[in-house]
Amino acid sequence: MLDCRAIILLWLLPWATQGLAVPRSSSPDWAQCQQLSRNLCTLAWSAHTPVGQMDLLREEGEEETKSDVPRIQCGDGCDPQGLKDNSQFCLQRIRQGLVFYKHLLDSDIFTGEPSLLPDSPVDQLHTSLLGLSQLLQPEDHHWETQQMPRLSPSQQWQRSLLRSKILRSLQAFLAIAARVFAHGAATLTEPLVPTA
C-alpha cells in the first residue's frame, strides 16, 4: 500500500511533467497584495509623522494594552518556509490585524479629527486597510474576527496619545506585512503558462 507522500507525488506528477505550477488553494494575488501593502506603509507614515517629544513618551499602561494589539510572530507561519508550506495561517493573522486597525480607525479616538476628512491620509489608510483585508478574505472561507478592545478616552489629550500610539503600532505591523507580501510576490506567484 502506498503511503501519503507517494500518493501526493503521483498526484503532482502530471503538473511537473507539463511544466505547470501546482495549483494552490485560495492563494491571494501576491503582486496586488504587495502593491497594496506598500501603499499602506506610505499612508501610515503620512498619517502619523513624529511630533517632537510626544512620540518619545511612554504612555502609562502601555504594557497592558500590548497583549490586545495583533502582532505577526514566529509561530504564525509568515517566515519563508511557512509561506511555502501553507500561507493561509499567516494570511489569516495579517487579515485579523488589518481588521483590528480598521476598527480602531473607526473608533471615537479618531472621530472629529480634521485628518479624517475625505481624502485625508487617515481616511485613505482606512480605505486601503479595508481593501487589503477584503483581498485576503477567500470567498469560500470566513475567518473569525477577534474581540476589539474598548478604548474610550474622555480627554482630548488622551485621544491624541492613543492616536499616536495606534498609528505607530500600525506602522510596525504594516512594515512586517509588506515584507511578507514582497516575499510572496517574489517566490510564490504562480508562473503564467503559455497556452497553445
From Swiss-Prot:
Report a single Gene Ontology molecular function.
cytokine activity
One cellular component (GO) term of this entry: extracellular space
Kindly state which keywords UniProt assigns to this record, in alphabetical order: Antiviral defense, Cytokine, Disulfide bond, Immunity, Inflammatory response, Innate immunity, Secreted, Signal, Tissue remodeling
InterPro entries (UniProt xref): 4_helix_cytokine-like_core (IPR009079), IL-23_alpha (IPR010831)
State the protein's purpose.
Answer: Associates with IL12B to form the pro-inflammatory cytokine IL-23 that plays different roles in innate and adaptive immunity. Released by antigen-presenting cells such as dendritic cells or macrophages, binds to a heterodimeric receptor complex composed of IL12RB1 and IL23R to activate JAK2 and TYK2 which then phosphorylate the receptor to form a docking site leading to the phosphorylation of STAT3 and STAT4. This process leads to activation of several pathways including p38 MAPK or NF-kappa-B and promotes the production of pro-inflammatory cytokines such as interleukin-17A/IL17A.
What is the gene name?
Answer: Il23a
**Subunit structure, briefly?**
Heterodimer with IL12B; disulfide-linked. The heterodimer is known as interleukin IL-23. Interacts with IL23R; this interaction enables recruitment of IL12RB1.
Enumerate the Gene Ontology biological process terms. Answer: cell surface receptor signaling pathway via JAK-STAT; cell surface receptor signaling pathway via STAT; defense response to Gram-negative bacterium; defense response to virus; inflammatory response; innate immune response; negative regulation of interleukin-10 production; positive regulation of activated T cell proliferation
The primary location reported for this protein is secreted
Q: Name one Pfam family in it.
A: IL23
Location(s) in or outside the cell? Secreted
- Signal sequence extent: 1-21
Instruction: Respond yes or no to whether keyword Cytoplasm is given for this record.
Output: no
The answer, when asked if Signal is one of the entry's keywords, is yes
Record's protein name: Interleukin-23 subunit alpha
